[in-house]
A protein has these predicted regions:
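Short beta-strand and strand-turn-strand segments in soluble, beta-rich domains
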Residues: 90-92, 130-139
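Trp-centered recognition loops
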Residues: 107-109, 113, 145-153, 182-184
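Beta-strand acidic-aromatic groove motif in beta-rich domains, primarily in extracellular
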Residues: 119-130
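Extracellular carbohydrate recognition and processing domains
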Residues: 134-165
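Extracellular beta-strand ligand-recognition surfaces/modules
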Residues: 153-191, 195, 199-201
Length: 201
């Protein structure tokens, strides 16, 4: 076989093998833990296709849907009694180790922009920031409005003790009966500064 034929053919074969290897990732939606950019951790935003990083947990249903103005929304639906109290056992975002380290000992403002789903829309939404075994915010419940609105709470993230665990942000509709669903447009985590221990009484 002449070199003028062999080398271009070999190069084409290698290129095809590389393409076939990376093809499953082309166009794939983001998944896994939410991570920062390595530079600015004062504001972490989860929106658009990145809402796909949610873990359904329990028997909840989660999916991305198209909203108005070409916005990608997160749909979360659950049935009554289907979800346990722990954040990680229901719909939740897992926060990567870099965010956990950057948020340790900081006050973080969690803001979720949400509204009831068009069908079986929830009247309330519940959110919980869990820092694993060192503490959690507890479930914060908000009354939803017909239109997209921001719902926020502040949480003093405990300082890391020992080995790093995993932080979670749980988000779910409040389900008094049957099933309920919410639509999420955006989630932001704002690091507002270090919290100070309370003075002893």
């Amino acid at each position: 076989m002449r070199d003028w034929f062999f080398f271009p053919a070999a190069l084409a074969l290698v290129a095809m093998m590389v393409f076939l290897a990376i093809r499953p990732g082309i166009g794939a939606l983001p998944s896994g833990a939410v991570a920062g950019d390595g530079a600015n951790y004062n504001k972490i935003a989860i929106e658009g296709d990145y809402l796909h990083k949610i873990f359904a947990g329990g028997n909840a249903k989660t999916e991305l849907v198209d909203g108005t103005d070409n916005k990608t929304l997160l749909y979360i639906e659950a049935e009554t009694g289907a979800l346990r109290d722990e954040s990680e056992l229901g719909p939740h975002f897992r926060l990567a180790a870099d965010i956990e380290a950057q948020f340790s000992g900081m006050t973080v403002r969690i803001t979720v922009r949400a509204r009831p789903a068009d069908d079986r829309g929830a009247m309330q939404i519940a959110m919980n920031y869990s820092a694993g075994r060192v503490g959690e915010s507890g479930w914060r419940v908000f009354d939803l409005k017909p239109e997209f609105s921001d719902f926020s709470f502040d949480y003093d993230v405990p300082r890391i003790e020992g080995d790093q665990g995993v932080d979670y942000l749980g988000i779910r509709p409040v389900v008094p009966n049957k099933s309920r669903a919410v639509l999420i447009e955006r989630i932001t985590l704002d690091r507002t500064g270090p919290w100070k221990p309370e003075d002893p009484a």
